[in-house]
C-alpha cells in the first residue's frame, strides 16, 4: 500500500484531490430540518424515537423514524418527551440511521415533556429493607416526609412512650445471648445447649 498522498480516490483523476463540494458530502454535513411527533420515549433510559412527517417543510408520504436522546431536548428541568407530542428538530444521517441534533416544540419553544419520572433507585432500596418512619411508625415514608406533627418519642422495641429502648423492661427480660435472634433460633440453641451439658452425679 502507498502513503496517503499516493492513494487514489474513486472518481478522482491521478494527482487530483477529491473536492468536498460534491452534493453528497454537502448533504451529510449540513443538518436537516424536520417536524413530526414523538413516537415513543423511555424516561428511565432517556431515549426514544420521533416520527418525522415533514422534512424541510415538505410533507412525507410515510413517517420516518428519527432517534432522539434526552440530551438533545430543548427544555428546562428533567428532559423527556410525551408520546404524541408535536416536535420540530434538526437531524443528521449517521451510520445507524437518522439522529436528532436538537429537538424543540413547534416554533422553537420548549418541549412539553412527559409527566412520568423514573423511580429513584435509593427510594426502591430503602423501601425494600422495611424501614419505617421514626415519627409515626408508618412503612410508606420516612420521618422527613411525614405529614403528622412531631409525635412523642417512644421505645423502638415495645412502642411505649413511657421509656426509651435503652431502659425497656420487655427487652431486659430477654436473655443477653438471644437478643436480636428470632424465636426459632433461640429454641434450637436451647435444645443444643441442654444436650451438651454433662449430667451431674450426686
UniProtKB/Swiss-Prot annotation:
Domain (CSD) ranges: 33-106
Region named Disordered: 1-31, 169-202
Annotated positions binding Zn(2+) 2: 155, 158, 163, 168
GO cellular component, one term: cytoplasmic stress granule
Segments of this protein annotated with the region Flexible linker: 107-130
The entry's keywords: Cytoplasm, Endoplasmic reticulum, Metal-binding, Nucleus, Repeat, RNA-binding, RNA-mediated gene silencing, Zinc, Zinc-finger
Pfam families xrefs: CSD, Lin-28A-like_zf-CCHC_2, zf-CCHC
Subcellular location: Cytoplasm; Rough endoplasmic reticulum; Cytoplasm, P-body; Cytoplasm, Stress granule
GO molecular function, one term: zinc ion binding
Stretches annotated zinc finger (CCHC-type): 131-148, 153-170
GO biological process, one term: stem cell population maintenance
Annotated family: Belongs to the lin-28 family.
Notes on the domains: The CCHC zinc fingers interact with the GGAG motif at the 3' end of let-7 miRNAs precursors, more generally they bind the 5'-NGNNG-3' consensus motif with micromolar affinity. The CSD domain recognizes the loop at the 5' end. The flexible linker allows accommodating variable sequences and lengths among let-7 family members.
Quaternary structure note: Monomer.
Function, in words: RNA-binding protein that inhibits processing of pre-let-7 miRNAs and regulates translation of mRNAs that control developmental timing, pluripotency and metabolism. Seems to recognize a common structural G-quartet (G4) feature in its miRNA and mRNA targets. 'Translational enhancer' that drives specific mRNAs to polysomes and increases the efficiency of protein synthesis. Its association with the translational machinery and target mRNAs results in an increased number of initiation events per molecule of mRNA and, indirectly, in mRNA stabilization.
Protein name (Swiss-Prot/TrEMBL): Protein lin-28 homolog A
High-level lineage: Eukaryota, Metazoa, Chordata, Craniata, Vertebrata
